[in-house]
Curated annotation (Swiss-Prot):
GO terms for molecular function: nucleic acid binding; phosphatase binding; troponin I binding. It comes from Mus musculus. Pfam families: Calcipressin (PF04847). InterPro entries: Calcipressin, Nucleotide-bd_a/b_plait_sf, RBD_domain_sf. Interacts with protein phosphatase PPP3CA/calcineurin A. Residues 183-203 are annotated as: Calcineurin-binding. The gene is Rcan3. Inhibits calcineurin-dependent transcriptional responses by binding to the catalytic domain of calcineurin A. Could play a role during central nervous system development. Residues 1-25, 202-239 are annotated as: Disordered. This is Calcipressin-3. GO terms for biological process: calcium-mediated signaling. It comes from the Eukaryota. Belongs to the RCAN family. PANTHER family: CALCIPRESSIN, CALCIPRESSIN-3.
Length: 239
């Protein structure tokens, strides 16, 4: 009985271990497949390549040009070429990004007419909408009416009434009664208190400055007198 129970327990443990290993292998293989699919996603790659430092014969000799184009037609039948002779570059346009990637991997730094081909992906042209999505957007203008007033005021807004200006009429009355060189009685005297009188006088500093630095008077330029010789000649002619 004990042997049978031990044997059955060992068999159950082995079955559990094998099932756990199978689940782990399935999880690992599933993750690897997902990672490979992400790695093989070539939709973001450009469909054009640039061949740099191309031999001059490709631009001048038709046979060399056809040989050069034949290297890339193996990957895509609809491939087109744009030759830039002054820069010694050729733009190769494929119909699919997969073909461009294969050509880049297999033909980069391969020899052609005694020189190594340098193949580089062309820059992907990003549209305006996609470019805007790649940056952070400004916050939504929910409560920006204090920064710049809207066309219509917000709900519950009321215009505040301006307060009346504070005017000291007593001060204005006292200033209006003042005159040049006259005295002004602030408080009238009583039997027990003297009166308060203000006398306007010139400051001593202004008088000292006037004596030290007198103002210069501009003398008017005198009109020049007519020469006597010219007057005598005129008198002789008149006589």
């Amino acid at each position: 009985m004990l042997r049978d129970s031990l044997k059955s327990w060992n068999d159950s443990q082995s079955d559990l271990c094998s099932s756990d290993q199978e689940e782990e292998e399935e999880m690992v293989f599933g993750e690897n497949e997902d990672g490979l699919e992400e790695m093989m996603d070539l939709s973001d790659l450009p469909t054009s390549l640039f061949a740099c430092s191309v031999h001059e014969a490709v631009f001048e000799v038709q046979e060399q040009k056809e040989r050069f184009e034949a290297l890339f037609t193996l990957y895509d039948d609809q491939v087109t070429f744009q030759l830039f002779k002054s820069f010694r570059r050729v733009r190769i346009n494929f119909s699919k990004p997969e073909a461009a990637a294969r050509a880049r991997i297999e033909l980069h730094e391969s020899e052609f007419h005694g020189r190594k081909l340098k193949l580089y992906f062309a820059q992907v042209q990003v549209s305006g909408e996609a470019r805007d999505k790649s940056y952070l957007l400004p916050p939504q203008p929910t409560k920006q009416f204090l920064i710049s007033p809207p066309a219509s005021p917000p709900v519950g807004w009321k215009q505040s009434e301006d307060a009346m200006p504070v005017i000291n009429y007593d001060l204005l009355c006292a200033v209006s009664k003042l005159g040049p060189g006259e005295k002004y009685e602030l408080h009238a005297g009583t039997e027990s208190t003297p009166s308060v009188v203000v006398h306007v006088c010139e400051s001593e500093t202004e008088e000292e400055e006037d004596t030290k630095n007198p103002k210069q008077k501009i003398t008017q330029t005198r009109r020049p007198e007519a020469p006597t010789a010219a007057l005598s000649e005129r008198l002789d002619c008149a006589l």
